[in-house]
């Protein structure tokens, strides 16, 4: 990890009116993804090993520290903030952080606060999320088959997730379904999943499996290029490319037969690096400038070194200056190893 020292005597005060941070390749960094915990109540086979060793709780940033870091990024031009995990809603007292960050929207300093969830806790928190200023969420859901759902999550209950989605829609949240396309597992039911999502007014986004972290299965067995999935869908559906964007990497098509939108996230077959506008913060204060690279900055040390947010801003600037041009994702069929050693649950999915 690169933790180059920075002279605190050169610290400059934060300027909330400054332009967004710009990386060495001219990309404005306006989107922060924050993993508030590495813990999850599921153990999805492509995301985690079944017997994960979670981070000691003493290593995690407090919610107040996470709030301070998020505020520092907002002051430096971040306009969109997404909370992830693990499963963000299993973090104790997480609504404190969400409510505090919602105040940034009220003050006009943040355009959007959202989160990615597995849906298991939505029945409990959906209405409160809306009250805190959250307007849309992503729900990870790879199958509508209860047995397959239990198989891929290892112990999840599909009915609980579907109840959570119903609660979110009833509360007024805009819901997008994220599904990892897996060969010989859920590829045959993606048309059904798409019809179901579109019939309820939800977008569906398909994602190629990403080679991150050691898991208990061989990813190459289930890797499915979305170019192939699109060709299959076009046998039964009319897909038209549209310019719709949500600030993320998905490219969207409109499905004439359902009237809904289908997103495609293709980190391996068609990467999105040239327009990358985001960085990722872990629950331990590590900042990853790229999902598919290992270079990182230790913001926890800067956070705890001083109460001076100007020093923290300098450390952030130095990190953004190291944001790479692109990731190194590749499916390594020869050696059966991930391109990046850390799990997605640590980085933030």
From Swiss-Prot:
Entry binding sites for GTP: 33, 82, 116, 176, 278-280
Residues annotated for S-adenosyl-L-methionine binding in this entry: 46, 86, 140, 210
Binding site residues for [4Fe-4S] cluster 1: 40, 44, 47
Disulfide bond annotation, renumbered to this chain: none
A Pfam cross-reference name: Mob_synth_C
Coiled-coil stretches noted in the UniProt entry, renumbered to this chain: none
Record pathway: Cofactor biosynthesis; molybdopterin biosynthesis
Reactions catalysed, as given in the entry: GTP + AH2 + S-adenosyl-L-methionine = (8S)-3',8-cyclo-7,8-dihydroguanosine 5'-triphosphate + 5'-deoxyadenosine + L-methionine + A + H(+)
Cofactor(s) the record lists: [4Fe-4S] cluster
CDD domains referenced in this protein's UniProt entry, alphabetically: Radical_SAM, Twitch_MoaA
HAMAP family attached to this UniProt entry: MoaA_B
Known partners and oligomeric status: Monomer and homodimer.
Cited function: Catalyzes the cyclization of GTP to (8S)-3',8-cyclo-7,8-dihydroguanosine 5'-triphosphate.
Family per similarity comment: Belongs to the radical SAM superfamily. MoaA family.
Name of the protein described by the UniProt record: GTP 3',8-cyclase
Annotated source species: Rhizobium meliloti (strain 1021)
